[in-house]
């Protein structure tokens, strides 16, 4: 594999320290200055102990950070020992294999094999992942010393189906030496397949017992100890996530609280009525004679297809079946031929001695095609939903999952009884000693000093330093406050009367002037009550034309008042403003405008000012020298990909790239594209990056007066969101060359740093002393950073909790440095990242990830606003299989409209984040 980076033998970094054998990423000697660079607090960062021969996927850790005040925290992990013996790895093939068997059935087959078929061979017991991998702590004694063996046996379970013959073939594929993992955590072993397999084996060991006992997914299991019914046929079960994670010189099991969405147990009638939002006694709503609408049947079918039901027929054992689809007619109306005579489903069951109580109710069709009345089916509890939770239930899921830090920590510690590592025969067999007696591990953290922020002329305090991740706009003016020359108000909420509109106008004008914006006393035109018969775009056209007739120009801004359920209207408004006309729009919910406070309108101004070209605040240069060095002009990118929801086929993924155009890293622009569904690599990254870079250089020349030679960036910092650890290599091999190509095509000679920012992980931190926590939430304070103990043994990474946290337990962002030509120290990169978390324009609180990454997330989520709502393209265009997908993708790309040229240079995305297209 080709080595990436500058590939020099000897070079000099910008600070003048000599580098030996420097390469931009793993695959060669580490980028360690011979004389350690100074950290932000003037100290030399603590050195690391990594053997020179060790290779990595990303950048080797250059040093440990030292900046900030020390803080001791608990991490939600338990320390574990490693096995002393060789682990034997076997491939598993189960026949018959005409279809993929459920993992749960596979687990039961292997359990039956070990305990009933070949007990002597599996002593001590082996562990199995439910698919292809089985691990044993001693070599399985196959006859004749063979490497492979077939076990044939008959297996019957409690589903009511006849016993079947199965053949399990086990083939030895490797021996896993845990010593490789021990060498890895002390920095003497590369992160290779041997290490990955060892980690995989240990994860299978700790998950084996819960997988056999409880409902589970890949990494979590769920217990019925804490259940909440939220409607829609859904129950939420509290559970536990667990994952073996190598740390620095120690190995841990990361344990967290998780939430599983289950189908409600009980009768199928009860489940169906709950899904449809009907009362429990409204059984006849499911009657075809009463005329249950077909759309409701289809809605119910979408939700419960795939559910396992147990059929209770007198005189026969209960039988487990899977719902395939629903009928639109009742059992009394569904006819079929039996003994050359046409009878109904209801008559057939009556011939078996079963008189249906509800013969007119619709029926289910199960996997083998049989039709079964609803009343004969019950739903066993503990069935995980594989579909996305409906949007109207999301708030209840969040409420159930949200726990204050001390409560979450107690729940994890209380979960030791359920995890029961000491009682697991599998954990004991493999010699793991999980130290749960000592409780959660203690970790050394630091709290970084926040950056200073600079506001505009006329501010009583132009430079401020946030405290606890927050500040306010009292007596402050925007750094660059814009002028609203003309504006229009359009009201789409009938109950929002003229007096309410006048309150809105007064409150908004006052708030604008408080922060230094210039605005006329009155809007040029207002629509007190929109015409319910006319289209939204037509009414916005009329409002714009009225403004032009009255003032001779288009409005600078249109404020739109929406009803509470106005999400579809929002999409049409944004298409009109951002795509068709290039006029900024600000949508406000009528409910929030009613008797709104001055604080509410101040928050609206934060969004509006940047939408029309302003800058709210900038980082004060001396407090973030790593970001604002004038000798190294910088463009900071944020990039993201959003994929279609589970269960949707033929839908594309949407990509976004955001970058700053100004020298202060406060003014951002964005571009979005369409690509093949579920593809993580951004295939158009070169063109998207060029779009940002061209406009950045143009802005710096025209607006900042920079000479052409000084307008081009000398540093590029690329933050990438949404990439799993298994995709790091692909990002390096595919996206990094595209970013370099963009620079080369534009003649830009910039040093690149590429960083993955991850939020989908389960690492949490809790202050050891509650007095050190955030005063309101009890979380670790904003700026808490950890790059030791539970961090990666060899690669440059850190956890940064940059926000104060309001509800629940804050989740830190995990930063992994994949490529670094800028030779950042741990302190400088941590400080830079923390500073960027304070530049999210629509907030006076630091956010959980750097602002450009947050913006990229929003741009992806708003991708549906690039489609003409009149075509209903997002809901009508759906390919049914992979052969249709290319045509569907072409259609999605063709109908994806580019931003209006005026909006392409503005922060049009500084607004509410709506759900992505699904």
Q: What residue spans do the PLM features occupy?
A:
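Long, low-complexity, intrinsically disordered terminal regions
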Residues: 2-918
């Amino acid at each position: 594999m080709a080595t990436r980076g500058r590939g020099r033998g000897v070079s000099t970094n910008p600070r003048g320290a000599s580098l030996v054998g420097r390469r931009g990423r793993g695959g060669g000697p580490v980028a360690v200055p011979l004389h350690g660079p100074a950290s932000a607090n003037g100290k030399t960062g603590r050195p690391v102990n990594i053997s020179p021969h060790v290779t990595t996927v990303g950048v080797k850790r250059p040093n440990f950070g030292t900046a900030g005040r020390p803080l001791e925290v608990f991490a939600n992990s338990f320390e574990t020992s490693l096995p002393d013996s060789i682990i034997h790895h076997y491939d598993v093939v189960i026949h018959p294999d005409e279809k993929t068997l459920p993992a749960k059935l596979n687990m039961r087959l292997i359990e039956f094999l070990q305990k009933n078929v070949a007990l002597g061979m599996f002593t001590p017991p082996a562990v199995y992942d439910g698919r292809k991998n089985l691990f044993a702590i001693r070599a399985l004694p196959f006859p004749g010393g063979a490497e492979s063996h077939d076990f044939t046996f008959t297996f019957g379970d409690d589903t009511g189906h006849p016993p079947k013959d199965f053949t399990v073939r086990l083939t030895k594929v490797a021996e896993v030496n845990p010593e490789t993992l021990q060498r890895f955590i002390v920095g003497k072993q590369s992160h290779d397949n041997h290490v990955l397999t060892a980690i995989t084996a240990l994860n299978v060991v700790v998950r084996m017992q819960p997988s056999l006992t409880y409902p589970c997914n890949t990494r979590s299991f769920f217990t019925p100890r804490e259940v909440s019914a939220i409607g829609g046929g859904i129950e939420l079960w509290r559970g536990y996530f667990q994952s073996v994670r190598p740390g620095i010189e120690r190995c841990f099991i990361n344990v967290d609280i998780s939430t599983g969405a289950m189908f409600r147990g009980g009768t199928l009638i009860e489940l169906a009525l709950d899904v449809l939002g009907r009362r429990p006694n409204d059984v006849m709503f499911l009657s075809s004679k009463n005329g249950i609408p077909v759309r409701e049947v289809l809605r119910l079918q979408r939700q419960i297809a795939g559910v396992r039901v147990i059929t209770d027929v007198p005189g026969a054992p209960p039988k487990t079946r899977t719902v395939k689809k629903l009928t639109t007619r009742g059992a009394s109306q569904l006819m079929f031929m039996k003994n050359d005579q046409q009878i109904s489903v209801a008559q057939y069951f009556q011939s078996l001695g079963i008189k249906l109580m509800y013969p007119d109710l619709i029926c289910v069709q199960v996997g083998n095609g049989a039709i079964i009345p609803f009343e004969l089916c019950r739903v066993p509890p503990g069935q995980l939903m594989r579909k996305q939770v409906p949007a109207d239930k999301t708030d209840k899921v969040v409420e159930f999952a949200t726990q204050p830090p001390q409560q979450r920590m107690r729940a994890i510690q209380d979960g030791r009884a359920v995890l029961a590592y000491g009682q697991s025969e599998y954990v004991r067999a493999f010699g793991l000693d999980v130290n749960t007696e000592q409780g959660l591990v203690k970790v050394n953290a630091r709290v970084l000093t926040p950056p200073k922020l600079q506001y505009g002329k006329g501010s009583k305090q132009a430079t401020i330093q946030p405290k606890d991740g927050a500040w306010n706009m009292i007596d402050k003016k925007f750094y660059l406050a814009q002028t609203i020359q003309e504006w229009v108000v359009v009201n789409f909420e009938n109950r929002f009367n003229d007096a309410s509109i006048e309150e809105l106008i007064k409150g908004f004008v006052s708030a604008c002037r408080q922060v230094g914006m210039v605005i006329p006393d009155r809007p040029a035109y207002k629509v007190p009550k929109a015409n319910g018969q006319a289209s939204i775009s037509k009414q916005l056209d009329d409002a714009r034309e009225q403004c032009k007739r009255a003032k001779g120009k288009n409005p600078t801004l249109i404020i739109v008042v929406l009803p509470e359920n106005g999400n579809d209207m929002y999409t049409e408004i944004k298409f009109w403003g951002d795509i068709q006309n290039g006029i900024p729009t600000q949508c406000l919910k009528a409910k929030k405008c009613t008797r709104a406070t001055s604080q509410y309108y101040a928050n609206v101004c934060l969004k509006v000012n940047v939408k029309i070209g302003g800058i709210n605040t900038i980082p004060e240069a001396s407090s973030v020298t790593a970001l604002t060095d004038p000798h190294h002009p910088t463009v900071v990118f944020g990039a993201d990909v959003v994929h279609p929801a589970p269960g949707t086929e033929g839908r594309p993924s949407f990509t976004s790239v955001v970058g700053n155009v100004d020298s202060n890293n406060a003014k951002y622009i964005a571009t979005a594209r369409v690509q093949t569904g579920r593809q993580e690599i951004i295939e158009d990254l070169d063109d998207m990056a060029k779009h940002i870079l061209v406009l950045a250089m143009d802005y710096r020349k025209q607006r900042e007066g920079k000479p052409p030679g000084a307008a081009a960036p000398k540093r590029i910092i690329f933050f990438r969101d949404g990439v799993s650890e298994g995709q790091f290599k692909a990002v390096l091999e595919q996206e990094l060359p595209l970013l370099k190509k963009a620079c080369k095509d534009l003649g830009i000679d910039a040093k690149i740093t590429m960083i993955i920012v991850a939020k989908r992980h389960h690492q949490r931190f809790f202050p050891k002393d509650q007095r050190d926590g955030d005063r309101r939430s009890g979380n670790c304070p904003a700026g808490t950073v950890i790059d030791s103990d539970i961090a990666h043994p060899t690669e440059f990474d850190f956890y940064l909790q940059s926000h104060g946290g309001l509800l629940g337990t804050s989740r830190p962002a995990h930063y992994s440095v994949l490529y670094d030509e800028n030779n950042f120290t741990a302190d400088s990169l941590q400080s830079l990242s923390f500073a960027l978390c304070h530049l999210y324009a629509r907030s006076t609180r630091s956010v959980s990830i750097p602002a450009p990454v947050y913006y990229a997330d929003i741009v992806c989520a708003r991708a549906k606003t690039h489609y003409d709502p009149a075509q209903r393209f997002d809901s009508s265009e759906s390919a049914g299989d992979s052969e249709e997908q290319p045509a569907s993708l072409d259609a999605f790309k063709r109908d994806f409209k580019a931003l209006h040229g005026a909006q392409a240079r503005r922060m049009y995305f500084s607004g509410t984040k709506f759900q992505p297209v699904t």
